[in-house]
Structures are given as C-alpha cells and as structure tokens.
Amino acid sequence: MFSKCIWMEKAKEKPSEFFKSTKTSLKSILKHPEINTRKINDVVIKAHKIVIHTLQFLKMYILHHYQTQSQIIPIIDKILILNVMKVVCGEKHTNQGRLPKKETLELIENLTSFYIEHYKPHTQPEQLDYEYMSNVLSYLCEDIMTMYENNIQLHYVDYVERFVNVVWKKKMMVEKIRKIFPTKKEREARVRQLEKELRKIKNDLLNVDSNVDYTSHPHYHKWITQQKKCILPNKKFQKQSIYYDLKCKPMDYLPCMIAMMKQVENDEETISNVFPLRSSISPGYIRLDTITLVYLLLRKEQGKKRDYCNQGNTKKHEDKIWKFFFRTEKKVFRKNGFSFHHMISTDGVGVSILFIREDLVGKRLPSAKKGVSKELYIDELNDYSKLQDKKVIGIDPGKSDLIYCVDDASKNANVFRYQPHGTQTKTPRA
C-alpha cells in the first residue's frame, strides 16, 4: 500500500519540460493539400532565402563595423536582425501598422545605405518580400539569435585554443620534434611536453579569477596578460567563471572571437567561421501560428481575414481556425499532460506539432535560469578524490558498434561491444 502511494505521488508530479513536440508528415494532417501545400511551401522557400541573405548581410555589416569603428561591433539583438530582414526584402507591399520609432528609422536608413553601397553589388538580384510574414520573421529572429549564441557558447574556448596553437607555432614545433628525435618514444614524450605547456597557457588565458595564480612558465606571463585584453571582454565576469559567463552573456565574446581569427588569418593559417551561415539548399523549418495561418491560407470565399485578426478573435476562434485547416481530431494532436499550443514548425514536408504543459495554458511561462550545467566533463573537475576508488570505463559510440566500452588502456583490457544487430559481446582485448 505504501509503495502504491509513492507511485501515485510520482504520477501527480508535473513534467519538468514546458513544451513537447510530436513529429509527423505535413500531408498526413493538412486539409485540402492540393491548395494549402503549395502556399505553405512558398512561404518556407521564401523564409529560407530571407535567412540566407540575412546571415550574409549580418556578417558583412558586423565586419565592416568592426574594421571602421575601432574594433567595436553593433549591438546584435532581435531589433537589428528584424530590420536587416526587412532591408534585404525591400519595400513591404502593405503600409498597415504604426510608424517605427525614431531610433528604428535611423537604423533602417543606415542598413539601407549599407545594403545599396556594399551588399547589393556583390549579390545576385532576387525578388523577396515578407507580405503576411511578420510573425514568421519574428520567430526567425529568435532562431538567428540562437545560432549566434550557440556558436559562441560552443566554440569560444576552441577559438582560444586555436589562437594559442597558431601564435606559438604548435604545428611547426611538432614537425621539428618529429625530425630531430630519432625514436618514437622520444618524439611522443616531447610532443606531450609541448602540449602540456600550451595547455597551461590556455588555462591561464581562460582563468578570470584574480585570486588564482598563473600555472604556466613565467616566461609566458607578460604575453598572457597582454592577450587577455584582446581575447576577453572588458567586464566583470559572472561568478568569476568564463564558462558560466559564456552562458549568461555570450554576445560579449563575439568581438574577441573576431580578433582571434584576424590574428590567425594574418599568420596565413586556416580560420574558423565566426559567423553562422546557412549553406544548405534544403529549406529549414519555420514556425506557423494561428494568425499566420489566417493570412496565408484563408481565401476570400471563406471569410475576411480582418474578422479573425481583430478584437481578440484570433484567440477566441483558434481551435476553430486550426480545425478548418488541419485534422486536429487525429491522435497526433493529443499528448498526455500537455495541450496543443496552436503552433507548428514545418519545412513543407515534415512537421513538428508543439504542445504546452496543461497547467501553463494561458499563463506566463516561468523564466528559465541561465547558467552552466551541473554536470561537468571529467577534465573540468577540480577534485578527483571521489574517483580514486571507482572503476573508470571509457565509452565510445559509433556506427559499426553502437557502444564500445573498455576498462583500461592496456592490451589486456576488458571490452564490451553492442552492435546494431543486437548481439552483445564481452571479450578481453586481443
């Protein structure tokens, strides 16, 4: 009885996720596909082209600003991205809506001037517009901001490591070691020593805690202090941790990444792309909400669009609107503990149906806390005492072996393999 009560209490617990999604094909849920599929595909392709031009324009605009404004870049936010989208599309067909603020008008004028002078001469002429796509553009702005933030959070440390390797000529030093030392054992020892030395330099560069001393050789300390002014933002770091601060305010690190890659480029080495671009010819997913459906799919004989978009009618009739265009009675539109959020993501072929937790329907969502994950990689730990008595297992996923495990680095290590056909093998390494 006691265990049953515990089980019932766990069953009542709210899911940790605010949203969930279910993926299916667009044709399986869309009504009147002979008419509506083409309309949705047109918007998907148009949005894909807008994103391509927006990302390219942003790269050119930010680099130009960096080079002409003393290594200062413009504030990259949704307002800038949205206005870039509008500039690359040209004039809007309809003039409905309130006038932009004075600051926005000045920004648009500046972006338009840059577009005509610098961007347009280097691109193929392409007719784009964003008629009835205001909400779609807003969602795309969020996606582009996420692209920039993810790129910085995931790769900033890699850029620092690349920068150190290039400045201190790691590639050339390794080649010299391989030529000078005759035996393999000596070569490997010298390379390990070099890598250990460079690792200490990288750690010192990434250390923002003033109470922690440098660990590298004193010969490098002056250089490290000088380079920190270029490759770290001039600010107070959250919790004295660069990894935590990267999660909180990643955009502060973009000028630093540009500076590092400029130095790598000057040394005629291969650079990494600081700016996210879209090179795929396959369109990406776009989000469609209720009001976008009305503007895109509602025909004249079915009613006036403004009747569904004024006086709160969009919210009042959202179930009716979605039922009119989609087969919402299907099981795929239901999920236990969640309610259909009246929003989908689609690339014209596949579709992801978005669900929101039932207790959050119609409410303001709790703010998600930004910060580093509680889980750390083993090389990020400061205290290894708890691992001393544990058996360490190395796991490597792959294609031929879904999982490959070893318990030692020697030839006598035990190996556990799980292959695609489902057979498990446990053998000592030969």
Model-derived segments and spans:
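Nucleic-acid substrate recognition interfaces
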Residues: 1-430
